[in-house]
Amino acid sequence: MIYAQILAGGKGTRMGNVSMPKQFLPLNGKPIIVHTVEKFILNTRFDKILISSPKEWMNHAEDNIKKYISDDRIVVIEGGEDRNETIMNGIRFVEKTYGLTDDDIIVTHDAVRPFLTHRIIEENIDAALETGAVDTVIEALDTIVESSNHEVITDIPVRDHMYQGQTPQSFNMKKVFNHYQNLTPEKKQILTDACKICLLAGDDVKLVKGEIFNIKITTPYDLKVANAIIQERIAND
């Protein structure tokens, strides 16, 4: 089976003094998360669409989805303490509720990236079915500088080899779950990216080309940019 998981477990502290997590903030009259989920319900290949939410915001998430979207594939579940635990909670939910096979894949995506395209979703599904681990990326536009002590430059990697990670990130569910279970508690604490889990296990991670407008709405400035993108699209329709 093919699952989508919308990662809406964060609290959005970088958004500043707001009354709710950033995924529920309005974007052109609808919550950001609704714009994102709308992209996924258009794809008929998904058997279920999981929305991972903070426990205290699950009812709010369900109410928002029901207000704007009618699709019985959608299930709101509890997120985890961090990004990777949220993904693993999704896999645990699937295993307990529907059962898990060797071929099941999951397409995980940030709730606050509402501008992903049908192409990106399709290529993630195809690549995950083929390789078992996928990251969506764009070429790095700026030179990347590394500093191990946060004071002086320790390395400047070749920009042609650098990419900026986006989402979706997609995985064979059994594989990534087993890799995660094999990590030490210390590794689990420091790893913030699920693709790194697969890399550490020796798996190849396929690259899917993202889009520069597939932005993550994290700060008030990002929200202004997102509104500008929508207004431009409305004007061009």
Swiss-Prot record:
PROSITE patterns: ISPD (PS01295)
Organism lineage string: Bacteria, Bacillati, Bacillota, Bacilli, Bacillales
Annotated disulfide bonds: none
UniProt site positions, description: Positions ribitol 5-phosphate for the nucleophilic attack: R159, K216
Annotated source species: Listeria monocytogenes serotype 4b (strain F2365)
Keywords, sorted A to Z: Cell wall biogenesis/degradation, Nucleotidyltransferase, Teichoic acid biosynthesis, Transferase
Described purpose of this protein according to its UniProt entry: Catalyzes the transfer of the cytidylyl group of CTP to D-ribitol 5-phosphate.
Site (Transition state stabilizer): R14, K22
NCBIfam families reported for this sequence: PRK00155.1-3
GO biological process: cell wall organization; isoprenoid biosynthetic process; poly(ribitol phosphate) teichoic acid biosynthetic process
Protein name: Ribitol-5-phosphate cytidylyltransferase
Enzyme Commission number(s): 2.7.7.40
Superkingdom in the source lineage: Bacteria
Family: Belongs to the IspD/TarI cytidylyltransferase family. TarI subfamily.
Gene3D superfamilies: Spore Coat Polysaccharide Biosynthesis Protein SpsA, Chain A (3.90.550.10)
Recorded catalytic activity of this chain's protein: D-ribitol 5-phosphate + CTP + H(+) = CDP-L-ribitol + diphosphate
Pathway field: Cell wall biogenesis; poly(ribitol phosphate) teichoic acid biosynthesis
InterPro entries with a match to the protein in the record: IspD/TarI, IspD/TarI_cytidylyltransf_bact, ISPD_synthase_CS, Nucleotide-diphossugar_trans, TarI
HAMAP family documented for this protein: TarI
Top EC class, one word: transferase
Molecular function via GO: 2-C-methyl-D-erythritol 4-phosphate cytidylyltransferase activity; D-ribitol-5-phosphate cytidylyltransferase activity
Residues bound to CTP: L7, A8, G9, G10, G80, E81, D82, R83, N84, E85, T86
